Amino acid sequence: MVNIQIRELEEKDLFNGFLESLDSLRKASDLSPKKAKEVFKKIKSDKNYKIYVAVIDSKVVGTTTLFIEQKFIHDGGKVGHIEDVAVRKEYQDKGIGKEVVKALLGYAKKEGCYKTILDCTDDLIQFYEKIGFKKVFSYP
């Protein structure tokens, strides 16, 4: 595997591969710099959000978001929600998505989440099962 660094998203990453990485899910790189910085600051100020990036040669090539939800059940426990797992097309199938997800799962555990969940399309179920997720429900 290539040498990757997994770390928290920084403002300088927005136009250094981060938004382009999200393009593998849905077009994000056309977001204006002003709007991108506004969204970054809003998310960064919310302690329940964490965005990790995968960096190779100083360029962001992948990303994943974790949202932590406080619950009344489970004695006021927390649930982690994985969102926006994205890797730039030319870096896919190199284990990068897996590493970023695993890093956020570790963070969720450290934050006391009693479980971490995600939604995905059927073609991605096998990818997440390899990481340790279990399929619970599928829409008809």
Regions found by a protein language model. Give the residues of each.
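Glycine-rich phosphate/pyrophosphate-binding loop shared by adenosine-nucleotide-utilizing enzymes
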Residues: 4, 59-63, 80
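Conserved catalytic-core motifs of GNAT/GCN5-like acyltransferases
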Residues: 68-71, 117-119, 123, 129, ...
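Conserved beta-strand in the GNAT
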Residues: 53, 59-68, 86
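A short helix-loop-beta-strand connector motif used in the catalytic cores of GNAT acetyltransferases and
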Residues: 41-53, 81
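Conserved GNAT acetyl-CoA-binding A-motif
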Residues: 101, 108-120
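Conserved acetyl-CoA-binding loop-helix of GNAT-fold acetyltransferases
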Residues: 87, 93-106
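A conserved beta-turn-beta hairpin within the catalytic core of GNAT-like acetyltransferases
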Residues: 70-82, 92
